[in-house]
UniProtKB/Swiss-Prot annotation:
It comes from Pyrococcus furiosus (strain ATCC 43587 / DSM 3638 / JCM 8422 / Vc1). It is found in: Cell membrane. GO terms for molecular function: ATP binding; proton-transporting ATP synthase activity, rotational mechanism; proton-transporting ATPase activity, rotational mechanism. Transmembrane segments: none annotated. One of its GO terms (cellular component) is plasma membrane. This is A-type ATP synthase subunit F. Keywords: ATP synthesis, Cell membrane, Hydrogen ion transport, Ion transport, Membrane, Transport. PANTHER family: V-TYPE PROTON ATPASE SUBUNIT F (PTHR13861:SF2), VACUOLAR ATP SYNTHASE SUBUNIT F (PTHR13861).
Length: 103
């Protein structure tokens, strides 16, 4: 199964260096966001893709992400950090493993 990353150039370069199988770079233009939307649809149809990593900012621009069981779609922060903040992450961890994270 392949891991694919979609996002800004800095994020994509980092994941390429880490050995991700496929990486797709997009900017903030409407044309680029439409290309990303089409690429996401294409990736969802492929049997060889197991995980799609997409930056939170790109996911926000694409709009609602499809709710599918497979491949797994994970939103990741970009170089500017998470747009959702720590509260969302804390809630996800609490629901996933039943442990409350405190600072």
């Amino acid at each position: 199964m392949k891991i694919v990353v979609m996002g800004d150039s800095d994020t994509v370069v980092g994941f390429r260096l880490a050995g991700v199988h496929e990486a797709y770079e997009y900017d903030e233009s409407l044309e680029s966001v439409e290309r990303a939307r089409n690429k996401l649809r294409e990736l969802l149809e492929r049997d060889d893709v197991g995980i799609i990593l997409i930056t939170e900012r790109l996911a926000q621009r694409i709009g609602s992400l499809p709710e599918v069981k497979f491949p797994i779609i994970l939103q990741i922060p970009d170089k500017f950090g998470s747009i959702y903040g720590e509260d969302i992450l804390r809630d996800v961890v609490r629901r996933a493993i039943g442990v409350e994270l405190k600072r």
